[in-house]
Structures are given as structure tokens and as C-alpha cells.
A protein has these predicted regions:
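Bacterial Sec-dependent N-terminal signal peptides
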Residues: 1-24
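Carbohydrate-interacting regions of secretory-pathway proteins
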Residues: 19-136
């Protein structure tokens, strides 16, 4: 009897663990164009965004000037981000903006994860954003 109860408990535990929410992967870049992205340039720029941001050979290409950024048109939460990048030539000041707040301005309220050679992984608070330690 004890073995039957133990087997039943193990089966129920296995079923409950396998019923958990599965992670789904969503590609943010389709490799063809910038559909699903919003490109923002410094308001003093006279260039169209298409002269700065584009797609070449399945990769996003960004010209270094003027200042600006790209963001996804859709908002995400509870996410994991995987990014790959490389510099052709000497790396310059660049980064990934995280938790960008509404309002497409330069510089937005956001956290920047620095990608510049020698500073990769540093966090920079942009647009007056603040970070605080929360005790639990």
C-alpha cells in the first residue's frame, strides 16, 4: 500500500512539473528588414532614419552618426535577451538600452548596457533614470 501511494505521489509530482509554463523563443529581428522596430535619431539630424539604420546580408547595420537608437515597437516583460555584436574596426560608444520608457527622445529614460570595448557590461543610467536596491 505504501509503495502504491509513493508511486501515485511521484506520478502526480512528475505531471505537475511537466505542466509548468514553457519558455517560448521570439526572434526580434527577421533578418530581412526592420519591421517591428522604431528608429529614433537626434532631433537635430536632417538624415532620414533609413540612411542610418538598415539591413545588409541578414544583419542590422548602423552608421555611427548621428546619435540615435532603435527599439522594438512592442513592449516585453519577464524576458531574457540574447544579443550578438561585433565591431568592424575600432569599437565606439554603443550599448543596449533596457527598460526604455515611453517617449522617443534622445536620451530616453532607460538603462544602457555598454557594448564598448573595455567597458562591455557596464550599466549606465540614461535620461534621469535611477536604480535603487530593494530589500526583501
Amino acid at each position: 500500500m505504501k509503495n502504491n501511494i509513493l508511486c501515485l505521489a511521484m506520478m502526480m509530482l512528475t505531471i505537475m512539473c511537466s505542466c509548468g509554463q514553457k519558455e517560448t523563443k521570439q526572434e526580434l529581428f527577421n533578418g530581412k528588414n526592420l519591421d517591428g522596430w522604431t528608429c529614433v535619431l537626434d532631433e537635430s539630424s536632417t538624415l532620414p532614419t533609413t540612411d542610418v539604420y538598415g539591413v545588409k546580408d541578414g544583419n542590422i547595420h548602423i552608421v555611427g552618426n548621428p546619435f540615435g537608437y532603435m527599439r522594438t515597437a512592442q513592449k516585453y516583460n519577464n524576458d531574457k535577451l540574447h544579443a550578438e555584436w561585433r565591431w568592424i574596426g575600432e569599437g565606439t560608444n554603443s550599448g543596449l538600452f533596457l527598460h526604455v520608457q515611453d517617449g522617443d527622445k534622445l536620451w530616453p529614460n532607460a538603462i544602457e548596457c555598454q557594448l564598448c570595448n573595455g567597458k562591455t557590461g557596464d550599466f549606465v543610467m540614461l535620461g534621469g533614470s535611477k536604480i535603487a536596491e530593494v530589500e526583501s
